UniProtKB/Swiss-Prot annotation:
Gene Ontology BP annotations: negative regulation of DNA-templated transcription
Keywords: Repressor, Stress response, Transcription, Transcription regulation
Protein's UniProt name: Heat-inducible transcription repressor HrcA
Family annotation (Pfam families): HrcA, HrcA_DNA-bdg
Domain of life of the native organism: Bacteria
SUPFAM superfamilies from the UniProt entry: GAF domain-like, Winged helix' DNA-binding domain
Family, similarity comment: Belongs to the HrcA family.
InterPro entries per UniProt: GAF-like_dom_sf (IPR029016), HrcA (IPR002571), HrcA_C (IPR021153), WH-like_DNA-bd_sf (IPR036388), WH_DNA-bd_sf (IPR036390), WHTH_HrcA_DNA-bd (IPR005104), WHTH_transcript_rep_HrcA_IDD (IPR023120)
Function: Negative regulator of class I heat shock genes (grpE-dnaK-dnaJ and groELS operons). Prevents heat-shock induction of these operons.
Length: 344
């Protein structure tokens, strides 16, 4: 455990270093810390011995080590902080016409990446928590059809498929009837369970040959189990990490798994400093924040960047964008649930 003065010194070094990326000397600290230069140097030496500071090769100053940044995050960083100077810029950036949910999530991801220079990832509500509230099959031709699904009464999912060779029109009708009777109004996690247990037994009552029918069920509903992921600023990762991080960001489903694992049960926000279980994220910092998607649940807003990022401003931007996005989504869903009319 460090003393209060040592804590103040560490906090100030973190603040100055993240702004200038230059080693910090005792003279710069003396302007804020009410102690002699010798006392400050002594405390800096103790912080270095504890592994919280590192000596610069080109000067007598010190800079935070990864452990120092982690200590700062765990003991001094407020995860709910907001810098009012950024509010106007975020609100202005959100001033656009959105025609669907994905437009807003993609825009929010781009705004965060552009304002930080890092990499932003946004996840929709966790697939398992979504509910199938609508289902239809539209035959496009003699050989293909379109499954049209609605999640949470608002999110459309479409899957085009080739009609099995032995299918007749009545078979498509039976397929739709089974979905409506057994899967409609179920959560996605329950649908996953029923496809393995209940549906194979039900299909036997309607179809003589069941293999291609069960494959069709798997194909149509596999889309529901995938995360909806929006990544922005992927190229930025090359400025603060190596190629492995850049390549990892291409695997959106694995990215989603890693980010969800960064939050403990019941947590609304977290900051990991070189602490991810994912090897490609082991040498970067990951800020993760839940934001409300009205009527549906929580999405995830994440920022991936260097260990020496400006944590106060990054946390502030994540919080502001999360709040503005939630407000915009609230307006969007209220509009969807209202009576539509045209104003002349």
């Amino acid at each position: 455990m460090i003393t209060q003065r040592q804590n103040d010194i560490l906090n100030l070094i973190v603040e100055l270093f993240t702004q200038t990326h230059e080693p910090v000397g005792s003279k710069a600290l003396q302007r804020t810390i009410d102690s002699s230069s010798a006392t400050i140097r002594n405390d800096m030496a103790k912080l270095e011995k504890l592994g919280l500071l590192e000596k610069a090769h080109t000067s007598s100053g010190r800079m935070p080590s990864p452990a120092g940044f982690k200590y700062f995050v765990e003991h001094s960083l407020r995860l709910d902080s907001i810098d009012e100077q950024d509010i106007y810029h975020v609100i202005k950036a959100f001033d656009f016409e959105a025609f669907k949910l994905e437009d807003m999530l993609q825009k929010a991801s781009h705004i965060l990446a552009e304002m930080t220079g890092y990499t932003s990832v946004i996840l929709d509500v966790e697939p398992a928590r979504q509910r199938l509230t609508g289902f239809d099959v539209v035959q496009l031709s003699n050989h293909d059809a379109l499954a049209v699904m609605t999640l949470d009464e608002s999110k459309p999912v479409t899957v085009q498929f080739a009609i099995p060779r032995n299918f007749l029109t009545r078979d498509l009708i039976a397929f739709k009837a089974i979905v409506e009777e057994r899967l409609l109004d179920n959560s996605v996690i329950d649908i996953h369970y029923k496809l393995r247990t209940e549906i194979p037994q039900i299909v036997q009552k309607y179809f003589v040959t069941t293999d291609n029918v069960l494959q069709l069920f798997d194909y149509v509903f596999s889309e529901l189990f995938l995360e909806t992921v929006f990544v922005a600023g992927k190229v930025n990762s090359l400025t603060y990490s190596d190629l492995s991080t850049y390549q990892f960001l291409d695997n959106e489903q694995q990215v989603a798994i890693s980010l969800r694992q960064s939050l403990k049960e019941g947590e609304m926000a977290s900051v990991q400093v070189a602490d991810s279980q994912e090897a490609a994220l082991a040498d970067v910092s990951v800020l993760t924040h839940k934001f409300l998607i009205p009527y549906r649940g929580f999405g995830l807003l994440s920022l991936i960047g260097p260990i020496d990022m400006d944590y106060r401003r990054s946390v502030s931007l994540v919080n502001i964008i999360g709040k503005v996005l939630a407000a915009k989504l609230g307006d969007y869903y209220r509009y969807l649930n209202s009576n539509h009319y045209e104003v002349h």
